[in-house]
Amino acid sequence: AIETQLEEKKFLDFCCEHYQVIKDAGVRIAIESDFEPSRLDHFIRKLPNDVFGINYDIGNSASLGFSHKDEITTYGDLIYNVHVKDRPLGGTTVPLGEGDSNFREVFRSLFLVGYHGDFILQTARAKENNHLDVLLKYKNYTELCITKYFTE
């Protein structure tokens, strides 16, 4: 985690110094951060956006009490992929729909900013080793959200 201005400067300098190598390799780097939205926006826009972007974690944002709509409106054009996860305010990962993530707001906001990236299920584990059933439930929940809210 970047905690000081010096650490931030070192990270940004490193990324900028290695930008061309990363770009030439065809690699894109998605940064996941717990910075509050305006700080993350200011930070990520210091980097070339054809190589560096944001991995948006729905559950982490809910846990930190951030407004999904405000975040996505602020830097949605730089979101490379989305972790579909649910967490209560200040808590840990829970099954989708049981935390404070506002999936309607997330998917609607992503649609409005023209998001076309991946949705990655980073969900709570099955409690009774019925992993396939639980994953299918999460997949169906996510597809429902996309169908219902990721439209005009």
Where do the language-model regions lie?
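Histidine-acidic metal/acid-base catalytic patches
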Residues: 37-56, 60-152
